[in-house]
């Protein structure tokens, strides 16, 4: 049995020191684990656009994501539109991406896949 947990099963631990900022090699290793996400803001953030049938479903997703973000104490930047939400994770205190951004990206993708 594999005792490793997935990113979506992990929980966020504070990552506020500069040494927690991921380098290019680690980013390249983790990015395939969050399909659909891409580096943005000159490699300082993870971004994905989620599509929905209507505004109600978009807001339901955003509200569910807000609950997850609150529980993990790591909050994305979001742009909400009719039929889509753009979600962007970065660790502002380190000026880039840390492992908690990947954890939250994986949790966000899992939420979307549930059909919320």
Curated annotation (Swiss-Prot):
GO terms for molecular function: 4-alpha-hydroxytetrahydrobiopterin dehydratase activity. It is an enzyme of class 4 (lyase). The keyword Oxidoreductase does not apply. The keyword Electron transport does not apply. Pfam families: Pterin_4a. GO terms for biological process: tetrahydrobiopterin biosynthetic process. It comes from the Bacteria. NCBIfam families: PRK00823.1-4. This is Putative pterin-4-alpha-carbinolamine dehydratase.
């Amino acid at each position: 049995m594999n005792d490793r947990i997935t990113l979506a099963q992990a929980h966020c631990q504070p990552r506020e020191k500069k040494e927690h900022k991921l380098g290019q090699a680690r980013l390249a290793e983790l990015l395939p684990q969050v399909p659909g996400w891409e580096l943005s803001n000159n490699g300082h953030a993870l971004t994905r656009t989620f599509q929905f049938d209507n505004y109600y479903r978009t807001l339901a997703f955003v509200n569910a994501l807000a609950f997850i973000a609150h529980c993990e104490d790591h909050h994305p930047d979001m742009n909400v539109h009719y039929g889509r939400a753009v979600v962007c994770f970065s660790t502002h205190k380190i000026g880039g991406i840390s492992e908690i951004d990947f954890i939250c990206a994986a949790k966000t993708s899992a939420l979307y896949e549930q059909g919320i």
